Design a protein with these regions (language model features):
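Short acidic, glycine/serine/threonine-rich loops at helix termini
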Residues: 50
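Intrinsically disordered, low-complexity terminal regions
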Residues: 11-13, 17, 26-39, 43-45, ...
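Hydrophobic packing positions in regular secondary-structure scaffolds
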Residues: 20-21
Length: 161
């Protein structure tokens, strides 16, 4: 779903399978723009090698959400599964929690608690652009984990403080 997407909006009224917004065979990148809103949960490898765009998941993501991510944003209102952000270069994963069995990857650095103004700006923009499809979960005070430090480490995993 949305593999290779470069713009527009996809709204899924239920759950989604593997690789939403992810890599398509023969391409260098997954999603390169646009927005995907999934009302249910998303399976493994959501946003694999995503370059830009936004994926909003009302439920939880499966294992390896944002694996090898190059940019863009994932909002996981139900939480993220194991290995979220593994080998992420840039991008943001905003999650409500880590689901059972998931840990912060060892190659992510705890950067402390922050009140990020950009989250307010993003929430306002999503509300204006998406209306009722906008994320319902947008905390302003978050604990920021930078990574993946096994690569260039410019990505981030944000969890409520």
């Amino acid at each position: 779903l949305g593999a290779g997407m470069s713009g527009g909006l996809i709204h899924v009224a239920g759950d989604c399978g593997d690789s939403a917004g992810g890599l398509i065979a023969g391409k260098r990148f997954g999603m390169t723009g646009g927005t995907i809103v999934i009302d249910g949960s998303a399976a493994a490898r959501t946003a694999e090698k995503m370059r830009r765009g936004t994926i909003i998941v009302r439920g939880a993501t499966g294992a390896m959400a944002g694996v090898r991510m190059l940019g863009g944003t994932i909002v996981a209102e139900g939480g993220v599964g194991p290995d979220a952000g593994r080998l992420m270069r840039r991008g943001t994963i905003l999650a409500s929690r880590l689901i059972a069995g998931a840990d912060i990857p060892a190659t992510f650095a705890d950067c402390g608690v922050h009140d990020l103004v950009i989250l307010r700006i993003m929430a306002r923009n999503w509300t204006r652009e998406l209306g009722p499809l906008a994320p319902r979960f947008t905390p302003h005070v978050v604990r920021r984990y930078a990574g993946d430090l096994a690569t260039i480490g410019k990505g981030e995993l944000l969890l409520p403080a």
